[in-house]
């Protein structure tokens, strides 16, 4: 993957969104810790901005479920995740989600691919200067507000908070995201476990 592939894929997505008349809703963008993920996600954001579509880009890496949440929380038409999931680390990938927060399915997948394939010249892809995109409000950085909302929704799913309150301080937990993206949402500031400190 390279910036030209990212730009072509994003231009196809932008064209599809514009033809659907949903360009005012924006697109949420997340990325993982793979090589060039931050750069590729910014390239996607600037292509969207150049097409007049607001790009909401996470300030740092985030997991896929949080992107899915952000698409719905921010009322976006789509989401982009720059990741190759479980594939070897030398690879990267580009996944698209629709406004329901799920990966694209028919007819959207076929419609987006048709738009991508219709781009036969890279001169037909657009980009914008980052400073200009921010100034025009077309590039918005997603920070802790979405993290907090996401964790708030997850906490609503707790089945027995009393058990956590009673026994949580005695649990010894070791967690590592390895090379993954769980380091932000799984931090002590977001966990509901009481501490001994």
Would you name each region that the model predicts?
Residues 189-195:
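Conserved small/polar residues in nucleotide/adenosyl-binding loops
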